[in-house]
């Protein structure tokens, strides 16, 4: 896929609520998340009503799968399926730049919520251990909310991961 697409690796209203409107207006394809989150994308309108926002349900033009790559110019994101916050959550890892687009999987000092529909705490911890804690300490984590962090800091100080 390319930068001429609208990429959504997250599926809740706070991340994907305007996706359909933007894609239509800008004439872009929508890529992602993983198909396991289709139920959330088909409930965006209802999610929006709960928060007084307008949102349109949509089906992506292409779903993201574990092992896919997304290219932006000369930057390549390696897609990893990381269920837990949501069953179809994916992250993007740029190995060359040592950067991660983590969405709502890992935060500075915390982890994503698992109390939302089909969230699963153990799946989230397993995803983090398998796909993030295996990376070098200097990998920068761009979180879906809040300040950036890095793998080394989270490995040493994140209360959810210290004994994981």
Question: What kind of region is each of these model predictions?
Answer:
Residues 1-2:
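N-terminal low-complexity segments that are often proline-rich with Ser/Thr-Pro
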């Amino acid at each position: 896929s390319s930068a001429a697409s609208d990429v959504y690796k997250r599926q809740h209203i706070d991340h994907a609520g305007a996706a359909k409107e933007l894609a239509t207006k800008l004439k872009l394809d929508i890529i992602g998340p993983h198909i396991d989150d289709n139920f959330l994308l088909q409930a965006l309108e209802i999610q929006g009503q709960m928060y007084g926002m307008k949102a349109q349900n949509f089906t992506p033009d292409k779903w993201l799968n574990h092992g896919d790559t997304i290219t932006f110019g000369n930057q390549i994101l390696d897609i990893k399926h990381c269920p837990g916050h949501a069953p179809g959550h994916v992250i993007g890892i740029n190995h060359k730049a040592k950067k991660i687009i983590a969405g709502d999987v890992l935060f500075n000092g915390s982890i994503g919520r698992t109390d939302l529909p089909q969230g699963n705490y153990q799946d989230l911890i397993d995803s983090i251990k398998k796909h993030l804690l295996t990376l070098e300490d200097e990998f920068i984590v761009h979180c879906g909310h809040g300040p950036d962090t890095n793998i080394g800091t989270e490995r040493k100080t994140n209360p959810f991961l210290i004994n994981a």
